[in-house]
Swiss-Prot record:
This is S-adenosylmethionine:tRNA ribosyltransferase-isomerase. The gene is queA. It comes from Fusobacterium nucleatum subsp. nucleatum (strain ATCC 25586 / DSM 15643 / BCRC 10681 / CIP 101130 / JCM 8532 / KCTC 2640 / LMG 13131 / VPI 4355). It holds the Pfam family Queuosine_synth. Transfers and isomerizes the ribose moiety from AdoMet to the 7-aminomethyl group of 7-deazaguanine (preQ1-tRNA) to give epoxyqueuosine (oQ-tRNA). Monomer. Keywords: Cytoplasm, Queuosine biosynthesis, S-adenosyl-L-methionine, Transferase. SUPFAM superfamilies: QueA-like. GO terms for molecular function: S-adenosylmethionine:tRNA ribosyltransferase-isomerase activity.
């Protein structure tokens, strides 16, 4: 195990590293969803408990507000072929206009401006390369008949992160049970552990559940490559918080009730939308918020989250919520206890 430097508010990237055996990277979801392991971390006394996710109900209280990211993941990975027969992988990243998308192509250099790709046995989708961006991403215009969403659902596969090498048998397992709308290209994975039954039990306990939306982009997997983490350019994602939800959360905060965020995506949205008086603002906008140790949380009181990649901005976020040194000790403990890590991994509740 790596020795921890004695710097709690470090900006050194190496201070957010830990050793993870490859076999602990979750390759398939736990069945059922709420059977995942759950590590419980009490920030007041530093105690750590090991349970299953369905036990989380015992740690929720009447009056708590549970905030979910109800975004929907689209099957954004498709394959197209050129007239010459060459095959390219297309990963939809962000919709620009109704029929135009920013995409990642592999191999990217095989397609020239104006060239077309044909997708599906019957060429249900045709993609034309309109622009090559400075960062290497491509702008594609799609031609089709009928509903783009229905065609994509038929031809596309879920855009699993690169560390998951096993084929996903069921698309729904990379989707929360409460997903409603949106065009995310990665799942808000902390929410994957909830079942309908567990959510109903949580409601019956007197916990209020509210939904916000943040469209999760590929930037969530982008590694930090700068030695000083403050030099890292944070990706931007769009989010939406309704007037109704803002009112519920502000009233709960005023009454001293807990705001429990399901995942880092919900956390980033909430913490990006606070006025100078500490009130949550209802709005729809983009956020590039970078949360690292030293940040003072204004809305979130407790956090449900998975175990994140070494040297990632998400590990920095949870280190800001608790304590960098203690968090890395907890990660080392999770390795020892054979927890599963990353998107299809196990969960922790920091309260």
């Amino acid at each position: 195990m790596k020795k921890l430097r004695k710097r709690k508010m470090s900006t050194y990237l190496s201070d957010y590293d830990y050793f993870l055996p490859e076999e602990l990277i979750g390759q398939k979801p736990r069945e059922p969803r709420d059977s995942a392991k759950l590590m419980l971390i009490d920030r007041k006394n530093g105690s750590v408990e090991h349970k299953n996710f369905y036990n989380i109900i015992d740690y929720l209280q009447k009056g708590d507000i549970l905030v979910r990211n109800a975004t929907k993941v689209i099957p954004a990975r498709i394959f197209g072929h050129k007239d010459t027969g060459g095959v390219l992988e297309i990963l939809l990243i962000k919709r620009i206009t109704l029929d135009t998308w920013e995409c990642l192509l592999k191999p990217a250099k095989k397609l020239k401006l104006g060239q077309k790709l044909y997708i599906g046995e019957n060429k249900e989708l045709i993609a034309e390369l309109l622009e090559i961006k400075e960062d290497g991403n491509r702008i594609l215009k799609f031609y089709y008949e009928g509903s783009f969403e229905e065609i994509l659902d038929k031809l596309g596969s879920m855009p699993l992160p690169p560390y998951i090498t096993r084929k996903l048998e069921n698309k729904d397992r990379y989707q929360t049970v409460y997903a409603q709308r949106g065009e995310s290209v990665a799942a808000p994975t902390a929410g994957l552990h909830f079942t309908e039954e567990l959510l109903n039990k949580i409601l019956d306990k007197g916990v209020e559940i509210v939904d916000i939306f943040l469209e999760v982009g590929l930037g969530t997997f982008r590694p930090v490559q700068t030695v000083n983490v403050l030099e890292h350019k944070m990706h931007e994602e769009s989010f939406e918080i309704s007037e109704k939800v803002a009112k519920i959360i502000n009233e709960a905060k005023a009454e001293g009730r807990r705001i429990i965020s399901v995942g880092t995506t919900a956390t980033r949205a909430l913490e990006s939308s606070v006025d100078e008086n500490g009130k949550l603002i209802a709005q729809k906008k983009d956020t590039g918020i970078f949360i690292y140790p030293g940040y003072k949380f204004k809305i979130v009181d407790a956090l449900i989250t998975n175990f994140h990649l070494p040297k990632s901005t998400l590990l920095m976020l949870v280190s800001a919520f608790y304590d960098r040194e203690k968090m890395l000790e907890i990660y080392n403990l999770a390795v020892k206890e054979k927890y599963h890590f990353f998107s299809f991994g196990d969960s922790m509740f920091i309260y």
